[in-house]
């Protein structure tokens, strides 16, 4: 199996739909036959559990602390989709070295077709570093003016740290007096990967702590995420080709924390990876089964129980 593709889902501010997009793309890619791991990279304000209705016993923070292996912190959403959540307690954030994320991400590449990094908002080391780890950065934005400006800043940030911007996805599209997504992506100087219409099914699904792609797969938003997933699959390089990924290389320049990030990256990414982050093989994944700490979607639209 060729190494998987690492995709960072990013946006400058919270509330633009990063986690919604990361989770729904994960489900859509899995439904298309791909194997997917979603890694929650918001180490301070984790919330992916609210989208998937489960309480993890082990998290990415435990992996970074060296107390559990990566496989023990992966949870099965579906047969082809696993999630590595971050800790939800603020105390979990203490003494976390973001550069230690590199070997964790690298260890997942042999076992999955896609590794989706659900990044944090803002400009901080935990935001910057995932942009360096990804083969491509997927920018998420609404069509509102303030969101577009923030998306422009995120693109500039990704480019300054040698990230590769794969394109932009617009969510809650078709509202207000905003120009069409094609014009907005042109303004941003990024390829348009797709747009997700403003759809009440998304809010309904979130109220049920589920992705809309699972809750109402025939909704306009779910179908849009499906098309975006298809586009990503078609644009991925052949398995025999070298990707454009920059994992472990980076090139932070002219940033406040650049020197510190570069130094900690070198310290945290040794050639002899420890047991918690060694490369995994697909057939050795020891994720918790559904019903034993794993989880399954508990309700779909139209269910009466």
What is each residue range found by the language model?
Residues 1-16, 22-35, 54, 63, ...:
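Haloarchaeal acidic low-complexity proteome signature biased toward cell-envelope/secretome components but also
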Residues 11, 38-110, 205-207, 211:
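P-loop/Walker-type NTP enzyme "switch/lid" segment
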Residues 12, 142-143, 166-177, 195-202, ...:
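G-domain G4 guanine-recognition motif of GTPases
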Residues 36, 115, 137, 165-166, ...:
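Hydrophobic anchor at the start of a short beta-strand
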Residues 107-114, 121-145:
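Inter-motif core of Ras-like GTPase G domains
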Residues 149-168:
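Conserved C-terminal guanine-recognition region of P-loop GTPase G domains, centered on the G4
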Residues 184-216:
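Beta-strand-loop-alpha "switch" segments that mediate conformational coupling across diverse proteins
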């Amino acid at each position: 199996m060729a190494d998987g593709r690492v995709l960072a889902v990013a946006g400058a501010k919270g509330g633009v739909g990063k986690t919604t997009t990361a989770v729904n793309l994960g489900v859509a890619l899995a439904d298309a036959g791909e194997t997917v791991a979603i890694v929650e990279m918001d180490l301070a304000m984790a919330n992916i559990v609210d989208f998937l209705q489960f309480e993890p016993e082990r998290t990415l923070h435990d992996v970074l602390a060296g107390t559990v292996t990566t496989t023990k912190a992966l949870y099965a959403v579906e047969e082809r989709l696993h999630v590595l959540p971050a800790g939800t307690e603020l105390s979990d954030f203490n003494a976390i070295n973001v550069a230690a994320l590199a070997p964790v991400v690298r260890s997942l590449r042999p076992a999955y077709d896609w590794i989706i990094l659900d990044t944090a908002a803002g400009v901080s080391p935990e935001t910057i570093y995932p942009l360096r780890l990804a083969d491509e950065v997927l920018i998420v934005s609404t069509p509102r003016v303030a969101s577009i400006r923030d998306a422009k800043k995120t693109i500039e940030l990704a480019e300054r740290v040698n990230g590769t911007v794969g394109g932009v996805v617009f969510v809650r599209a078709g509202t207000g007096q905003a120009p069409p997504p094609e014009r907005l992506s042109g303004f941003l100087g990024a390829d348009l990967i797709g747009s997700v219409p403003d759809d009440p099914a998304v809010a309904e699904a979130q109220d049920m702590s589920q992705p809309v792609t699972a809750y109402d797969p025939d909704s306009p938003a779910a179908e849009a995420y499906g098309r975006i997933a298809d586009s990503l699959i078609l644009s991925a390089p052949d398995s025999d080709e070298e990707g454009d990924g920059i994992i472990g290389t980076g090139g932070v320049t002219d940033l406040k924390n650049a020197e510190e990030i570069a130094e900690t990256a070198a310290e945290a990414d040794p050639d002899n990876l420890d047991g918690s982050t060694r490369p995994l093989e697909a057939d050795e994944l020891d994720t918790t089964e559904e019903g034993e700490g794993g989880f399954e979607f508990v309700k779909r639209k139209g269910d009466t129980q």
